[in-house]
C-alpha cells in the first residue's frame, strides 16, 4: 500500500501595501472608538454627546466670526484690499444659481426653514426629540448663519466708505454751493419731466416692474466702465411675493446675501421703484452701508 501524498495548496492573501495599511489604521481606530463609545454610553448619553458637539461647533464658529471682525478692524488696509472682490465673486457664484428661478428663492427657503423649525419643535413637545438636542441644533444653525453672513457680505460694514473706494473728494460745502446744487437738480428734474411719457391725465406712465427690473442693472454696467468698484452682468431685480408683510413695516426692498438676491416690494410708490432697485443692486455689489447704497443708486 502506497501512501498517496496529496499536495495542499494554501491560498495566501496578497500583502497589503504600506499606504493602504496607513489608511486603514485610523479608520479602524475611529470605528472601534465609536463602537466602544456605544458600548459604554446609552442612547441618551449619545444624544448628550451630540448636543455637546454642536455647542462646541457653535462656539468655534462664533469665535471665528469674532476673529474676522477683529482682524478687519485692526488691519482694514489688508483685509479690504481683497475682501470686496472676494465678496463680489462669491455673490456672483451664488447668483448664477438663484437667478435660474424667476421668484425670490430666499422666500421659499425661509418657508421651508420655518416649517422644519416648527416640525422639530413639535417633536420636542411630543417627546420624540430631546430638548437639549433641539436647542443645540438651533444654536448651531444660528451660529453658522452669522458666520456665513459676515464671511460672505457683512464684513463690509467695517470697511471704507464708498467715497474712498471711488476716489471722491469729500469736504464740507458752503451754503452757496448747496443752493447752486439744489437749483441745478431742480432744473434737471423740470427738463426731464417734459420728456417722460404721460397719459391723458398728465400722469407719468411708468414701465412694468419686469421691464424696470431688467433695466436697473444697465446703470451699473455703465458705471463699471468708469469705476472698479462696480461690475456688470448683474441679474434682474426680483419682486417680493410676501410684499404684504413688508408693506406693514414700510420696507421697500431687501437684499439677501445667502441667495445673492436683490428684491423690491412692488407695493410702493411707483416713482421710488427704479431707485430702490438700484439701491438693492448696490448691496449686490458688496456695498453694505445704506447711505453708500443710496449714493450708488443715484449714480446708477
Regions found by a protein language model. Give the residues of each.
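Active-site recognition of the HExxH zinc-binding catalytic motif
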Residues: 102, 275-287, 294, 298
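Positively charged N-terminal leader segments that act as targeting/secretion signals
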Residues: 4, 13-32
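Membrane-interface segments at or immediately adjacent to transmembrane helices
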Residues: 156-223
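Membrane-interfacial entry segments at the cytosolic side of transmembrane helices
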Residues: 50-55, 128-139
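Auxiliary, metal-adjacent structural segments of Zn-dependent hydrolase domains
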Residues: 200-266, 270
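Transmembrane alpha-helices and immediately adjacent membrane-cytoplasm interface residues
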Residues: 118-119, 132-163
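Short, positively charged and aromatic/hydrophobic N-terminal segments
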Residues: 2-10, 32-36, 40, 44-46
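Membrane-embedded alpha-helical segments of integral membrane proteins
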Residues: 62-123
Amino acid at each position: 500500500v502506497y501512501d498517496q501524498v496529496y499536495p495542499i495548496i494554501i491560498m495566501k492573501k496578497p500583502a497589503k501595501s504600506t499606504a493602504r495599511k496607513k489608511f486603514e489604521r485610523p479608520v479602524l481606530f475611529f470605528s472601534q472608538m465609536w463602537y466602544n463609545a456605544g458600548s459604554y454610553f446609552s442612547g441618551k448619553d449619545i444624544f448628550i454627546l451630540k448636543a455637546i458637539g454642536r455647542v462646541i461647533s457653535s462656539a468655534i464658529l462664533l469665535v471665528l466670526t469674532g476673529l474676522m471682525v477683529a482682524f478687519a478692524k485692526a488691519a482694514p488696509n489688508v483685509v479690504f484690499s481683497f475682501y470686496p472682490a472676494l465678496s463680489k465673486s462669491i455673490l456672483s457664484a451664488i447668483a448664477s444659481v438663484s437667478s435660474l428661478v424667476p421668484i425670490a428663492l430666499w422666500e421659499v427657503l425661509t418657508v421651508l426653514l420655518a416649517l422644519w423649525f416648527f416640525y422639530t419643535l413639535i417633536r420636542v413637545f411630543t417627546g420624540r426629540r430631546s430638548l437639549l438636542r433641539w436647542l443645540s441644533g438651533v444654536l448651531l444653525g444660528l451660529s453658522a448663519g452669522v458666520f456665513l453672513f459676515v464671511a460672505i457680505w457683512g464684513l463690509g460694514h467695517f470697511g471704507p466708505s464708498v467715497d474712498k473706494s471711488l476716489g471722491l473728494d469729500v469736504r464740507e460745502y458752503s451754503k452757496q454751493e448747496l443752493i447752486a446744487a439744489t437749483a441745478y437738480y431742480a432744473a434737471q428734474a423740470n427738463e426731464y419731466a417734459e420728456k417722460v411719457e404721460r397719459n391723458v391725465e398728465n400722469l407719468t406712465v411708468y414701465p412694468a416692474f419686469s421691464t424696470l427690473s431688467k433695466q436697473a442693472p444697465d446703470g451699473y454696467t455703465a458705471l463699471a466702465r468708469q469705476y472698479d468698484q462696480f461690475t456688470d452682468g448683474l441679474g434682474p431685480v426680483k419682486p417680493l411675493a410676501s410684499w404684504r408683510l413688508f408693506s406693514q413695516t414700510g420696507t421697500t426692498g431687501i437684499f439677501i446675501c445667502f441667495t445673492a438676491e436683490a428684491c423690491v416690494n412692488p407695493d410702493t410708490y411707483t416713482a421710488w421703484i427704479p431707485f430702490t432697485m438700484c439701491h438693492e443692486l448696490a448691496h449686490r455689489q458688496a456695498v453694505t452701508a445704506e447711505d453708500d447704497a443710496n449714493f450708488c443708486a443715484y449714480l446708477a
